[in-house]
């Protein structure tokens, strides 16, 4: 090769490397023996913003149907707190192979525009769970650390191991400005910390299939999750309390339309008399916008904090016509609801 061209090629390669910039690894890399205290707080404000009920072409007031209802009171709030102490006994293949988790706090509280309020703590508070990775089952085995504790396994068997936000990490090394996405059940797991979404959906689907209403909840939940996507962007580093933390910006703006007509019609057909005919339309339109950021401690290999807000709007348009033995009737419901959610998480 001509020496001049060789030098030009090397110079071009060096320029390309400089243009691409250095790559950083945002990865879970906690050392064995590490203990982390983690806190997750979720608050939601919900409201029913509009409701129209019609029957045989006439708009109805819910109060006229005997319902004690005022749209101004159709709102409420919900709060959820989970705090744990995680002890990492063994790490393998980028995840805990053995983890001891003490549940310090697991409680929820609510209030409504009707004046109702309350709170409840889980029986698992104060207990320690042991997660052990089972390679053959490709899943974690969960058990109580104390065999003397009489707690129903239902209280903890759906508690997810991943409270490290690992699902939010990029698959490869990244440069500042690089983006990636998470969606579906991974995103649902971020919104509901501590819940094993796959197990919860499987359990709900099994319960529904054993009941009188043959609704495929798994199909429904996957349809809802399909359009939910978060975009994550690596925004470089930031000095916080003498630590250099990696900044991951969180964003998302998505819409989803669901036509549940066939699913609901199938569910109610078994309850209808043979001579009845039903024409049904149920459409749900959803839109959401998310913003926030996660700070990742690259040196320690775990998240330091996450703050995220999400605004969610849902519009339901349900209409039906029934002809039962020559007696025809029609009705419909139009409703619009909204929710503002705030999620905060810390690990130290």
Named regions from a protein language model:
Residues 1-8:
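Bacterial N-terminal signal peptides that target proteins for export
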Residues 20-348:
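Signature of exported/secreted
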Residues 7, 13-25:
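Bacterial Sec-dependent signal peptides at the C-terminal "C-region" and cleavage site
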């Amino acid at each position: 090769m001509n020496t001049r061209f060789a030098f030009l090629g090397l110079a071009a390669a060096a320029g390309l490397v400089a243009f691409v910039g250095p790559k950083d690894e945002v990865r879970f890399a906690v050392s064995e023996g590490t203990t982390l205290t983690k806190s997750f707080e979720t608050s939601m404000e919900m409201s029913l913003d509009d409701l129209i009920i019609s029957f045989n072409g006439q708009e109805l007031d819910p109060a006229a149907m005997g319902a004690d209802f005022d749209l101004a009171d159709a709102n409420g709030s919900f709060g959820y707190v989970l705090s744990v102490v995680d002890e990492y006994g063994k790490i393998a293949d980028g995840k805990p192979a053995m983890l001891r988790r003490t549940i310090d706090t697991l409680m929820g509280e609510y209030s409504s525009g009707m004046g109702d309020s309350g709170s409840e703590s889980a029986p698992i508070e104060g207990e320690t769970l042991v997660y052990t990775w089972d390679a053959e089952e490709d899943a974690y085995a969960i058990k109580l650390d104390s065999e003397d504790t009489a707690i129903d396994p239902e209280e903890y068997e759906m508690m997810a191991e991943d409270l490290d936000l690992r699902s939010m990490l990029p698959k490869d090394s990244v440069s500042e400005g690089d983006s990636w996405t998470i969606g579906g059940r991974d995103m649902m797991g971020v919104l509901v910390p501590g819940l094993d979404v796959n197990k919860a959906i499987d359990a709900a689907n099994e319960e529904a299939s054993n009941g009188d209403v043959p609704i495929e909840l798994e199909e429904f939940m996957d349809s809802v999750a399909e359009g939910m996507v978060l975009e994550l962007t690596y925004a470089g580093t930031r000095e916080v309390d003498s630590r250099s933390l990696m900044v991951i910006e969180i964003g998302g703006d998505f819409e989803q339309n669901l036509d549940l007509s066939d699913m609901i019609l199938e569910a109610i057909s078994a309850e209808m008399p043979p001579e009845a005919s039903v024409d049904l339309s149920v459409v749900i339109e959803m839109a959401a916008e998310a913003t926030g950021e996660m700070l990742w401690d690259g040196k320690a290999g775990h998240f330091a904090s996450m703050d995220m807000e999400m605004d969610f709007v849902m519009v339901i348009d349900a209409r039906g016509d029934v002809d039962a033995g020559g007696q025809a009737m029609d009705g419909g419901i139009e409703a619009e609801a909204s929710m503002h959610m705030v999620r905060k998480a810390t690990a130290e």
